[in-house]
């Protein structure tokens, strides 16, 4: 299969990369998104070598479950061992032996195919396009704010940052809170928030050396 993989120093396009050999569900990748985590991996995060990419929508090509074949799916990226206490409790993302799609010990979505356990996959209805479905994984990350904080409608909420994840978190917070201020440094990104009723503060200084 065609795949773009990271060898620890650079990204390489390989037109003859081996297909996934896991005894799992095989998914043909329709679309894959580029995440900030992917860029961090290029700078050494997780010391990962392999195929990057964990935001995807694809079509099931091979499965032990005939009903899954041909279905469009997105996937949870953490695959647990299914034997430890965390996995038994349904907390695979805390499994000490887990693999993480495109991040830890598991090839990702920047390829023609990927594989995941069927339990990690979620079927996408026809009413949702591939272009929308590819955002399911980052949107799920944004919804984790509800696990971390019990939001109250009367709260005044500040979101620091105007990147993609911050934008998604704001949309999640809007479901509960109406008084939201976003602090950011990119005027073009903040303008879109103003149109949706979000207050903005422009001028956060970057801490990056670049």
Predicted regions and their residues:
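Short amphipathic alpha-helix with an adjacent loop that forms part of the alpha/beta core around
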Residues: 204-210
């Amino acid at each position: 299969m065609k795949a773009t993989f990271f060898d620890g120093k650079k990204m390489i396009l390989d037109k003859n990369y081996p297909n996934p050999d896991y005894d799992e569900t095989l998914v043909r990748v329709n679309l894959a998104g580029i995440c900030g985590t992917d860029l961090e991996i290029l700078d050494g995060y997780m010391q990962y070598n392999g195929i990057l990419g964990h935001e995807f929508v694809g079509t099931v090509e091979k499965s032990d479950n005939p009903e899954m074949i041909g279905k469009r799916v997105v996937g949870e990226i953490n695959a647990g061992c299914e034997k430890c206490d965390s996995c038994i409790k349904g907390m695979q993302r805390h499994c000490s032996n887990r693999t993480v799609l495109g991040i830890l010990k598991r090839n990702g979505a920047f390829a023609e195919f990927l594989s995941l356990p069927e339990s990690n996959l979620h079927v996408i209805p026809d009413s949702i396009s591939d272009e929308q479905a590819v955002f399911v994984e980052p949107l799920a990350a944004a919804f984790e704010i509800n696990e971390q904080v019990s939001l109250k409608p009367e709260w005044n909420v500040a979101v620091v940052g105007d990147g993609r994840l911050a934008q998604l978190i704001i949309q999640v917070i809007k479901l509960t809170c109406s008084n939201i201020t976003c602090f950011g440094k990119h005027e073009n990104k903040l303008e879109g928030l103003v149109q949706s009723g979000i207050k903005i503060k422009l001028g956060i200084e970057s801490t990056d050396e670049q």
